[in-house]
Amino acid sequence: MEQLKNESSRQYEYMEEMKKWVQKKSEELGRKLTCHVTTFGCQMNEKDSEKLLGILETIGYEEVETEDADFLIFNTCTVRENANTKLYGHLGQVKKMKERNPQMMIGLCGCMMQEEHVIEKIRTSYKFVDIIFGTHNIFKLAELLKARVDSKGMIVDIWKNTDQIVEDLPSCLLYTSPSPRDCS
């Protein structure tokens, strides 16, 4: 239990570091950095997307309803039919946007990323993707984003399994709240 509290504290430290980075970038651009999370999948994906958006908003990103955002995350599913096809189709479109805006960052997560053949395809065919992570470590989004900012290369962090559940991190209730938006 103590280890999980320490991990939660560690992730908040990464959020604070990234908050400074986002603020600096926003000042350089003269506008807030924007983000968009696209969810392909089941209710678990929706819940995970709420957590991802909560972390992004905590570090200073502003959610927009378009995929032409500064940071775009695709949260994927292997259970829902056609999720793979949808993702690869969207990545084809996003590649053009990234060519126009090389500063744009693209993250892929979810259970589809747990499959080794998918990771290999992305590494070889979609080299413009910045961050790839699975279902077990979405709580590390700020840490992975920092690693990407520091390295300038693709970050891949897939955990095969874990008993680690990190709670007490921000979430933005989009799907499970009766009100249109509840971020905390």
Regions found by a protein language model. Name each.
Residues 175-184:
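Single conserved hydrophobic/aromatic residue that forms the stacking wall/gate
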Residues 79, 129, 156-158, 176-177:
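Hydrophobic aliphatic residue packing
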Residues 156-173:
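P-loop NTPase nucleotide-binding/switch module
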Residues 147-157:
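The C-terminal output helix
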Residues 121-124, 153, 170-174:
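Short, charged low-complexity intrinsically disordered segments located at boundaries
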Residues 74, 107, 153, 164-167:
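Residue-level signal for pocket-adjacent positions within structured domains
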Residues 1-146:
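Cofactor-cradling patches in redox/metallo enzymes
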